[in-house]
Amino acid sequence: VLNACYDVGIVKFFNSLKWSTMSTIIVDKIAKSFGATQAVQDVSFEVRPGEIFGLLGPNGSGKTTSIRVILDIYQPDSGSVTILGGPMTNEKLNQIGYIPEERGLYQDVPLDRCLTYLATLKGLTEEQITERLPKYLAKFDLTDHAKKKAKELSKGMQQKGQLIAALIHDPEIVIIDEPFSALDPVNTQLVKDLLIEQRNAGKTIVMCTHQMNQVEQLCDRLVLIDHGRVLLQGELSEVFDRFRTNEVIIDSLDPLPEELNGVSRIEQLNGGYRLTPQAGLSAHQLLDELLAQGIKLNSFEVAVPTLDEIFIKVVKEGNGKHE
């Protein structure tokens, strides 16, 4: 009996470790078409425990189809999806919290009853719901609105209600589409803090959004898809490094002349200039050139492209390949 208990303990121990050593979601060369429309083609990416992963792309790019394949709503025409070490099962579905872009609260049911019902579908007991639901309602400042029907709530309140529905069963994976829609700045920060809290707890978070500033602040890695194909993926820092240029932004004490040695292009900005060095000249060498020409500087910094700029550039280049 002791040996049996020991063996069971070992199994539980290694089961508790397994998601820290492998990807929780593996999407491998999936393809999905609807009639003559190829929605997704040869899409591959992995999502790891303890990270916020950005799934990005323009409208109609294939993001939603990819999510529905992951959730086993759609069967792929080819390729495969591995969830928590294997194929999707009903048990694994209960380890996923999903918020679609189309909101899903029952409009004619009081919020607390709706959330209780949804939590029951995810396998929570009455005791667990009684313990957890009041805490989440308080966290999202919804306690005083719990008896209101969803249709009586603002869009922001409904969004927070859906977040509760997605998180109350403590899932391993959270997939959330446009998490900040309809939220004011205070509640946006609340949701950001919550996502970071989930990441720090080792959860896997997949976030679809068009708000690139939120991706920059939250995501560890990302994939960008368009026309159903992967255009770009990697760690956020790697993506920025890949698109970094030698362009610099300066603020000078005096207006710049129209031409400068070592500079191929001068663009006037609001309160400064963007300079493009001549070919083969580094930003550091350009600084030396400017100082040698007597340019007096208040500031000098290497220009880092925003994720918005990278997004637009990559999508435009991708569209060019499809023309």
Question: PLM features: what roles do these ranges have?
Answer:
Residues L2, G9-K12, D28, Q41-S44, ...:
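N-terminal non-cleavable signal-anchor helices
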Residues T245-G318:
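Short, charged/small-residue-rich alpha-helical element at the C-terminal edge
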Residues S23-I25, K32-D226, L232:
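ABC transporter nucleotide-binding domains
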Residues Y98, T120, A138, N200, ...:
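Residue-level marker of structural boundaries
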